[in-house]
């Protein structure tokens, strides 16, 4: 799993039928200090995340184990909206401070 920040949405009128009703987000991965990396991915949103929220991403075959992703061609899924991140006893992110 990786930490990312939601940067935007992807809208698709025509898609694989099993993806009907799935919301897609553009996410940018973050390093251990919370700094943005130049690495982006489109992920299926399973939790109702919004732009600028920090999220947890499940990727690869593990993404297909997420409920509602089974039997769907999904390589990345947003599986959690992050409240706090602490690294080495230091707060990197607190959602309450970014609301």
Swiss-Prot record:
Keywords: Bacterial microcompartment, Carbon dioxide fixation, Carboxysome, Photosynthesis
A Pfam family that the UniProt record links to this protein: EutN_CcmL
Protein name, UniProt field: Carboxysome shell vertex protein CcmL
Induction conditions: Carboxysome size and components vary with growth conditions. When grown in ambient air at medium light (50 uE meter(-2) second(-1)) there are 7.4 units of this protein per carboxysome, the numbers are stable under low light, and increase under high light and high CO(2) (at protein level).
Domain of life of the native organism: Bacteria
Disulfide bonds: none
Gene Ontology annotations for the cellular component aspect, listed alphabetically: carboxysome
Location in the cell: Carboxysome
Domain description: The tight homopentamer forms a pore with an opening of about 5 Angstroms in diameter which opens into a wider tunnel at the base of the truncated pyramid. The pore is positively charged.
InterPro entries (alphabetical): CcmL, EutN_CcmL, EutN_CcmL_sf
Single annotated GO MF: structural constituent of carboxysome shell
Uses, biotech or industry: Heterologous expression of 12 carboxysomal genes in E.coli (ccaA, ccmK2, ccmK3, ccmK4, ccmL, ccmM, ccmN, ccmO, ccmP, rbcL, rbcS, rbcX) leads to the formation of bodies that resemble carboxysomes, have densely packed paracrystalline arrays and RuBisCO activity. These structures open the door to generating carboxysomes in plant cells to increase their photosynthesis and productivity, as well as tailoring bacterial microcompartments to specific metabolic needs and molecule delivery.
PROSITE patterns, A to Z: BMV
Gene3D superfamilies: EutN/Ccml
Main subcellular location: other
Assembly, per entry: Homopentamer. Interacts with full-length CcmM.
Segments forming domain BMV: 1-83
Loss of function: phenotype: An insertion in this gene leads to rod-shaped carboxysomes and an inability to grow in normal air, called a high-CO(2) requiring phenotype, HCR. When ccmL-ccmM-ccmN-ccmO are deleted no carboxysomes form, cells are HCR and RuBisCO is soluble. Both mutants grow on 2% CO(2).
Gene Ontology biological process terms in this record: carbon fixation; photosynthesis
Keyword set includes Transmembrane helix: no
Gene name, Swiss-Prot/TrEMBL: ccmL
Organism name: Synechococcus elongatus (strain ATCC 33912 / PCC 7942 / FACHB-805) (Anacystis nidulans R2)
Family: Belongs to the CcmL/EutN family. CcmL subfamily.
Function comment: Probably forms vertices in the carboxysome, a polyhedral inclusion where RuBisCO (ribulose bisphosphate carboxylase, rbcL-rbcS) is sequestered. Has been modeled to induce curvature upon insertion into an otherwise flat hexagonal molecular layer of CcmK subunits. Beta-carboxysome assembly initiates when soluble RuBisCO is condensed into a liquid matrix in a pre-carboxysome by the RbcS-like domains of probably both CcmM58 and CcmM35. CcmN interacts with the N-terminus of CcmM58, and then recruits the CcmK2 major shell protein via CcmN's encapsulation peptide. Shell formation requires CcmK proteins and CcmO. CcmL caps the otherwise elongated carboxysome. Once fully encapsulated carboxysomes are formed, they migrate within the cell probably via interactions with the cytoskeleton.
